[in-house]
Amino acid sequence: MSHQTGIQASEDVLEMFARARNGKYRLLKLDIEDEQLTVTACEKPASSWEQEYDSLILPLLEDKQPCYIMYRLDSQNAQGFEWIFIAWSPDHSHVRQKMLYAATRATVKKEFGGGHIKEELFGTVKDDISLKGYYKYLACQSSPAPLTMAEEELRQIKIKETQVDIGVDTKHQTLQGIAFPIEKAAFQALEQLREKRLNYVQLKIDIKNETIILADTTNTEVRDLPKRIPKDAARYHFFLYKHSHEGDYLDSFVFIYSMPGYTCSIRERMLYSSCKSPLLDVIENRLLMEIARKIEIDNGDELTPDFLYEEVHPKQHAHKQNFAKPKGPAGKRGIRRLIRGPAEAETAND
């Protein structure tokens, strides 16, 4: 196999990669020594990935020496455990070292197996690589792309156009797709829900700080759902719906957006509506949770077991049957006529 830098992984390193992919290790530190990729540190998992993150990674980062770190998450995809690939390139390292490690990154990912790598993190200072830095990276990834100068000018024009008092009948521009950051505790709760260690997560918007925060993770049955819906505030709910359908036992993730009508302020209604799509984008495309059904309600009383079942498994509408042509009155049909085809008529005449 040829590479840009000629750096390759030895057979020992490839064997270690295989053991790591099978879940034996939480962390591998990789360095380039004598023009070969080598494993210079490894750690086995002892607790959750969040609890071990900073204590395992940060002590391995040297001030003047680049390295790679493969860090294993607790989540899995179709190929196995998911990993974070970290490229550490400190500001004070030699330029030649920086270039060498930058040019070898693609090789490392390919040798390890790109399908196992969920996220890539690059850092020049430890704050970039810390757990807090990782969450900042995820928040940035889920935020909208920066606006061009023309788009920013257009945005300012629209803001000025809509800076008017909003009355009952006033038409106004609504906010579109606001991606508020998700706090750490909320993100962790969603991961636990995906792994089915929780069956209910409720999130709310901290309007003052403009963040999405955790509100509740109480273990919840279907019959308890109406009690979880506030009557005076909006919420986002994620529920692991365990049920049977056509003889199969199913686990389905359901998203419920509750908005109790006009008991909420205009700003609250606008923010919850605008943050919903970016939040679901993070859930479905970052956490890879498949949402079976998205429901909007204004009253928790709607969430009966039958309602939830029919939302997740909507009834198929039967095709309309054509009305049969009505028969004529009995005894008044007249003489039955026999209509012959052309061939039959000729035979009869012969």
UniProtKB/Swiss-Prot annotation:
The keyword Repeat applies. Residues 4-139, 177-313 form the ADF-H domain. SMART domains: ADF. GO terms for molecular function: actin binding. It holds the Pfam family Cofilin_ADF. It is found in: Cytoplasm, Cytoskeleton. One of its GO terms (cellular component) is cytoplasm. GO terms for biological process: negative regulation of actin filament polymerization. Keywords: Actin-binding, Cytoplasm, Cytoskeleton, Repeat. Residues 316-350 are annotated as: Disordered. The keyword Cell inner membrane does not apply. Belongs to the actin-binding proteins ADF family. Twinfilin subfamily. Actin-binding protein involved in motile and morphological processes. Inhibits actin polymerization, likely by sequestering G-actin. PANTHER family: TWINFILIN, TWINFILIN-1. Interacts with G-actin; ADP-actin form. This is Twinfilin-1. It comes from Xenopus tropicalis. The lineage of its organism: Eukaryota, Metazoa, Chordata, Craniata, Vertebrata.
